[in-house]
């Protein structure tokens, strides 16, 4: 008997970053979430929906095709719903506060220009930054029900995006949205945890960050970041495996005071 009728995912796919051949590298149940990781065991019921991930042979980008046909309403219904905070308990309190503290302490120069928190969710980071003297910061989330659409015609010196890149199914579509907000000498400051060879050798299903119920569906390498940056007229750099930046020509002043690696 042929296994073909049972196949639910092709063995290879074109990379969403560079277009190169990508091979299957792992699978997890859709229900895999932060609550499971926090408990150290499976606490969410299995959904029976397998999420297959591919890894690009060229740039190393890891992605899934499972959500390619989803509309924003689908993400709102199945991921960013009333149960989301249970899967990501830092979402409403700890993370916005710690991110604002990090920016205020390490990159105070950002307060000298207009800032946009892209993918802002409830807008809590804006509140935390304003409380720390960042008075020209605004929020925008393309998937939020009540979002500030007045920013769509504005430009900003710095666009910040914490925990955004791993949530979007199409990296180039995400970049299209973000680049439109940049001033000519503006920069994007963002966080996402890079996927490493060690993670892939151990199995992506063992990696705590691979949690589709949390919306974690796209995972980058430095090569993948350089690829999407180049295609949008930007250069890429990283401070560490979790904090990165895109810029056009001149390195932003706030980046020069810290050790970093440039990928472009």
Q: How should these model regions be labeled?
A:
Residues 163, 167:
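A short His-aromatic
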Residues 193-198:
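Short "lid" loop at the C-terminus of a central beta-strand within the Rossmann-like core
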Residues 1-158, 162, 172-177, 181, ...:
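Conserved N-terminal segment of class I S-adenosyl-L-methionine
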Residues 168-169, 182-184:
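Helix-to-beta-strand junctions that scaffold the AdoMet/dcAdoMet cofactor pocket
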């Amino acid at each position: 008997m042929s296994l073909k009728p049972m196949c639910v995912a092709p063995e290879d796919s074109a990379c969403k970053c560079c277009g190169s051949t990508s091979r299957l590298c792992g699978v997890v149940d859709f229900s895999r979430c932060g609550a499971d990781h926090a408990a150290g065991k499976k606490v969410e019921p299995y959904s029976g929906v397998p999420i297959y991930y591919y890894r690009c042979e060229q740039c190393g980008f890891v992605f899934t095709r499972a959500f390619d046909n989803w509309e924003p309403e689908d993400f709102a219904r199945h991921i960013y719903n009333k149960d989301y905070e249970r899967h990501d308990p830092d979402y409403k309190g700890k993370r916005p506060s710690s991110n604002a503290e990090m920016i205020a302490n390490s990159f105070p120069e950002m307060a000298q220009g207009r800032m946009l928190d892209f993918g802002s969710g409830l807008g809590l980071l804006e509140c935390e930054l304003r409380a720390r003297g960042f008075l020209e910061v605004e929020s925008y989330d393309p998937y939020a029900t009540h979002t500030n659409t007045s920013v769509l015609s504005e430009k900003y010196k710095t666009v910040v995006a914490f925990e955004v890149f791993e949530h979007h199914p199409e990296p180039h579509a995400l970049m299209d949205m973000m680049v439109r907000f940049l001033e000519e000498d503006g920069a994007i400051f963002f966080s996402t945890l890079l996927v490493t060879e060690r993670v892939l050798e151990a199995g992506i299903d063992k990696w705590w960050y691979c949690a589709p119920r949390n919306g974690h569906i796209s995972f980058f390498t430095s090569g993948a970041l350089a690829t999407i940056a180049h295609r949008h007229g930007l250069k890429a750099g990283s401070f560490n495996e979790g904090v990165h930046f895109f810029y056009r020509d001149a390195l932003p002043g706030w980046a020069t005071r810290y050790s970093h690696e440039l990928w472009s």
